Regions:
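Rossmann-fold NAD(P)-dependent oxidoreductase module
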Residues: 75, 200, 204, 333
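C-terminal alpha-helical "lid/dimerization" subdomain adjacent to the S-adenosyl-L-methionine
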Residues: 287-337
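Amphipathic alpha-helical interaction motifs in eukaryotic regulatory proteins
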Residues: 39, 43, 56, 123, ...
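C-terminal lobe and adjacent flexible extensions of AdoMet/dcAdoMet transferase-like proteins
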Residues: 21, 353-358
């Protein structure tokens, strides 16, 4: 093949390819830093930064590894997980919002590594002619069945979802999102898991009756939320593909991206029926927390989440035949399910709050 690009352009392209190919190294190095306890040591030295000698003394590593720690931190500083303050020849480190988050929720980093070997067999899946998700085709069972078979996997998944719900709930019940719940008297959290999100909403809004709706075996394991003892919080077992309890607002946090368009329309139709049955004046709404993929971003910046959205889209495609959707794709779902309008509030990093109206 004769290239139309100059040698300089090809060299630059090579570097760009390397940059994407090596991103897994950041994940592995960050996990290593957490396992060594580096964020904990720096946190204990706060509010001031931690010098490299003080960090090394606390880690109690063999002297042969001291320069390796410096080089590990150099990469993680560049990736934005630590901040470097250099005074003459001494390196001093402090936490950034990203590492503070990992200190609070260390499972944020854990994405299941290669998800049962799915990624390494992806090209094999592309060559198949059936419609099974990559995970199902490669594992011989659904991703969820594979998770249930491995004793460590499902608890790890629910721990990650619980940590995420705690973080998202803090934003949802803040003044920043107060308008979302204005005029809502009852709320049904569909696929609400063990009730962490609903418990936060019920605690912040005593006037809202909150119902956690999920599979019976899921809501049965809701000790943490039940222990709070909120009188306006209840748990109901069932399936969103049959009938959803009535409510002024129906909440689906990170649910639709697990499903293809056909199943999403079924879920949304049941949500519309539940809202319409509750509010005869059609003031009700469905509240979605999901990614809205933006593919028009040209210049990357700290608030550009295009890469994580696109990676998440492929993750859902491979694991469960789901997808992350653009605004146009969401609009098509809403129209097909019989809704009249929607509003998007980009308030949760790579995710958005979408209010959908009957």
């Amino acid at each position: 093949m004769v290239s139309s690009s100059s040698d300089i352009e090809l060299i630059e392209a090579q570097g760009r390819i390397w940059g994407y190919a090596y991103t897994y190294i950041i994940n592995k190095c960050l996990k290593c830093a957490i396992q060594l306890g580096i964020p904990d040591v720096i946190h204990r030295h706060s509010p001031g930064p931690t010098s490299l000698p003080a960090l090394l003394a606390a880690l109690q590593l063999h002297p042969s590894k001291h320069d390796a720690v410096r080089r590990l931190l150099r990469l993680l500083v560049h990736a934005g997980f630590f901040k470097l303050e250099q005074e003459e020849k001494e390196c001093n480190y402090s936490l950034t919002p990203a590492s503070e988050l990992l200190l609070l929720f260390p499972d944020k980093l854990d994405s299941g590594d290669d998800a049962f070997g799915v990624w390494s067999s992806l090209s094999t899946w592309f060559r198949r002619s059936d419609g099974a998700a990559a995970a199902e085709a490669i594992l011989g069972m659904s991703f969820w069945d594979a998770m249930a078979r491995e004793r460590w996997a499902m608890p790890q998944f629910y721990d990650a979802m619980t940590g995420d719900s705690k973080l998202v709930a803090r934003v949802m019940v803040s003044d920043y999102c107060r308008d979302v719940f204005r005029g809502v008297g009852s709320l049904v959290d569909v696929g609400g898991g063990t009730g962490i999100m609903s418990a936060a909403i019920a605690g912040a809004y005593p006037n809202i009756s909150c119902t956690v709706f999920d599979l019976p075996e899921v809501v049965a394991d809701s000790r943490e939320a039940r222990a709070i003892g909120l009188p306006n919080l209840e748990f109901v077992g069932g399936t969103m593909f049959e009938k959803i309890p009535h409510g002024d607002a129906i909440l689906l946090k990170w649910v639709l991206h697990n499903w293809d368009d056909e199943n999403c329309v079924k879920i949304l139709k049941n949500c519309r029926e539940a809202v319409s049955s509750s509010d005869k004046n059609n003031r009700g709404k469905v509240i979605l927390i999901d990614m809205v993929v933006e593919i028009n971003q040209i210049v990357a910046n700290d608030k550009d989440f295009s890469q994580v959205q696109l990676c998440s889209d492929l993750l859902m495609m491979c694991l469960v035949n789901g997808k992350e959707r653009t605004e146009a794709e969401f609009n098509n779902l809403f129209i097909t399910a019989g809704f009249s309008g929607y509003k998007i509030v980009r308030a949760l990093g790579p995710r958005s709050i979408i209010e959908v109206y009957p």
